[in-house]
Amino acid sequence: MLRAGWLRGAAALALLLAARVVAAFEPITVGLAIGAASAITGYLSYNDIYCRFAECCREERPLNASALKLDLEEKLFGQHLATEVIFKALTGFRNNKNPKKPLTLSLHGWAGTGKNFVSQIVAENLHPKGLKSNFVHLFVSTLHFPHEQKIKLYQDQLQKWIRGNVSACANSVFIFDEMDKLHPGIIDAIKPFLDYYEQVDGVSYRKAIFIFLSNAGGDLITKTALDFWRAGRKREDIQLKDLEPVLSVGVFNNKHSGLWHSGLIDKNLIDYFIPFLPLEYRHVKMCVRAEMRARGSAIDEDIVTRVAEEMTFFPRDEKIYSDKGCKTVQSRLDFH
């Protein structure tokens, strides 16, 4: 916006100067100068008007850090690690005018813990239309890459899709869901785009964002959470350093992670492995209340309790964590 404003000012100044020196130049020269300045002003005005009615990729659009922080803190429950890491990673990346590589996040945890929800929050804070934006691209492994015998075809298609869309918008976001169901080797096709290259075939990928969502590593995360609970320590005491190293190694060695022996891990191209902790009873109740508010319903604590108690919890003896997180809250609330 600052650049556009400066250009408009420059164009206006050019018109003013052209008018004041009209007597000192030939009529044709003056006409050309005024015409050029008018063309610049007209283009900028057209571009501004166009972007009011159609989605434009505005690279200079700043990230509203306060709005992002509020969304994460008020809408994501029981995930203090994810909230902190994602906020710092995104704000740091977007505040860097010259990043050396794309931002790559790998989100891990059992179903219903908030991974997809966070990717939606991130998309909406980066592009106003969120997941509906032309600059946000969602890949679902079982839908887009179902056949193991077509790995080479998928790799070629993936490279072309990413190259074309980053060429159109440097700030593109790519989300890969169900990474644990992705055939090994497919994701390595994007390795050149995640590396520290200034350009690849004339295209810079340094301002793009890649997000991987996976259930892989959920068992490792749960074990750590349980160890803390059994030791009488709060879940909020769990730090990223308690999980990230174990998570990266575990995913690398897991044949069903989508990142098995992947060059993305081997070459340290994934910036953060972000654990999503299993949700407790109190977090499920938070999800029920949030869903009620989203539906415009008054909060009925009796219903909140009944829905939460209908969920199943594990381990068998302690019954601490919801085995489906908050995934079935919406459908269960329909019965009340």
From Swiss-Prot:
Transmembrane among keywords: no
Keywords, comma-separated and alphabetical: ATP-binding, Chaperone, Endoplasmic reticulum, Glycoprotein, Hydrolase, Membrane, Nucleotide-binding, Nucleus, Signal
A GO biological process held by the record: chaperone cofactor-dependent protein refolding
Modified how: N-glycosylated.
Signal peptide limits: 1-24
Cellular compartment(s): Endoplasmic reticulum lumen; Nucleus membrane
Superkingdom assignment: Eukaryota
Class of this enzyme: hydrolase
Binding sites annotated in the UniProt record for ATP: 109-116
InterPro entries membership: P-loop_NTPase (IPR027417), TOR1A_C (IPR049337), Torsin (IPR010448), Torsin_1/2 (IPR017378)
Gene3D superfamilies for the chain: P-loop containing nucleotide triphosphate hydrolases
Tissues in which the protein is found: Widely expressed with low levels in brain.
Gene Ontology CC: endoplasmic reticulum; endoplasmic reticulum lumen; extracellular exosome; nuclear envelope; nuclear membrane
Family: Belongs to the ClpA/ClpB family. Torsin subfamily.
Quaternary structure (record): Homohexamer. Interacts with TOR1A; the interaction may be specific of neural tissues. Interacts with TOR1AIP1; TOR1AIP1 is required for TOR1B location on the nuclear membrane. Interacts (ATP-bound) with TOR1AIP2; important for endoplasmic reticulum integrity.
Role: May serve as a molecular chaperone assisting in the proper folding of secreted and/or membrane proteins. Plays a role in non-neural cells nuclear envelope and endoplasmic reticulum integrity. May have a redundant function with TOR1A in non-neural tissues.
Descriptive protein name: Torsin-1B
Organism, scientific name: Homo sapiens
GN (gene name): TOR1B
